[in-house]
Design a protein with these regions (language model features):
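Beta-strand-rich N-terminal accessory domains
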Residues: 36-85, 104-106, 110-125
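Sec-dependent N-terminal signal peptides
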Residues: 7-14
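Active-site loop/turn microenvironments that scaffold catalytic and metal-binding pockets
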Residues: 77-141, 239-249, 253-255, 260
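C-terminal motif of bacterial Sec signal peptides marking the signal peptidase cleavage site
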Residues: 16-18
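Bacterial N-terminal signal peptides that target proteins for export
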Residues: 1-7
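Extended, loop-rich substrate-binding clefts of extracytoplasmic carbohydrate-active enzymes
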Residues: 25-52, 120, 124-185
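Acidic, contiguous internal or C-terminal segments within carbohydrate-active enzymes
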Residues: 48-51, 55-61, 161-217
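Conserved small/polar residues in nucleotide/adenosyl-binding loops
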Residues: 267-269
Length: 269
């Protein structure tokens, strides 16, 4: 894991000088040069956001992913609270989607096929012997070099054009992701937009692994979580979603009021 962790998704900021200084070392200890490489004629890089509240977020256009989130606690001590790696090579070697944007469709699609408007679309399976497709296929959005459309003090705008037929999905699809850091508050917003020229399915997601203590030897059971969601999508014994939307009330997934993760045995479901 090379000295990378995870943080509460609450505050980032971008240091403009990071876009120009190849020798930069971030507050989290990352070196920009370790994220600069060429892949099939496209270039990867590291972008650093930071604000006056002491937060720093590092983002790479490889997979439009978060590499680190450094956030201060109530005593001003800063910790990196997301899992990750220290070089672009390590991200390319692993298959766990650390910090990445997942698409076109997060999760599994049963038997790697779906029917839309009466037309069956056969996808390219990548989920072992199951014959399903997982997280949009291989390669997915997490493996792509995203175009950097904007990089200023508090914003990074990235885009990717997924061509018609990529992994079997219909339609040319342009996805734009904007990471925005609050200037006066430790809050990070992720905004996705997508346009397509044909009917298709889309289920984008962000895939960071968090431990907001900053200590990855500790369990997350005692950490508090709040999720403003009334329903969830259950999955079957094949780990494919059933298509239902069920209420979270009375389940371990009910975080409408903040409570510790271990309180309802969420980690065991």
């Amino acid at each position: 894991m090379s000295g990378k962790h995870g943080i509460v998704c609450m505050g980032l900021l971008m240091l403009l000088s990071s876009c120009h200084d190849d020798k930069q070392v971030t507050a989290s200890g990352l070196q920009r040069k370790d994220f600069q490489t060429e892949v099939n004629g496209q270039y990867t890089d590291l972008f650093t956001l930071s604000n006056k509240k002491g937060m720093e977020v590092c983002i790479t256009n490889y997979g439009a992913r978060v590499v680190s989130i450094l956030v201060p606690d109530k005593n001003g001590k800063r910790e990196d609270v997301v899992c990750g790696f220290s070089t672009i090579g390590e991200y390319m070697e692993q298959r766990q989607n650390f910090g990445s944007t997942v698409g076109r469709y997060i999760g599994r699609i049963l038997n790697a096929r779906f029917t839309l408007d009466g037309v069956e679309h056969k996808l390219v399976p990548n989920n072992g012997k199951s014959g399903h497709i997982s997280h949009g296929g291989n390669p997915g959005f997490a493996d792509r070099i995203w175009k950097v459309e904007q990089a200023d003090t508090y914003t990074v705008r990235l885009s990717y054009l997924s061509p018609d037929g990529e992994n079997g999905f219909p339609g040319n699809l342009k996805v734009t992701l904007v990471y925005s850091l609050g200037e006066d508050e430790n809050a990070l917003d992720l905004t996705y937009e997508a346009t397509t020229d044909a009917p298709t399915v889309l289920n984008l997601s962000h895939h960071s692994f968090f431990n907001i203590s900053g200590d990855f030897t500790k369990s997350v059971e005692d950490q508090q979580l709040w999720v403003d969601a009334d329903r969830f999508t259950p999955y079957d014994d094949k780990k494919c979603v059933t298509g239902e939307y069920l209420p979270v009330a009375g389940t371990p997934l009910d975080f409408r009021m903040p409570h510790t993760i271990g309180e309802l045995s969420l980690i065991h479901i």
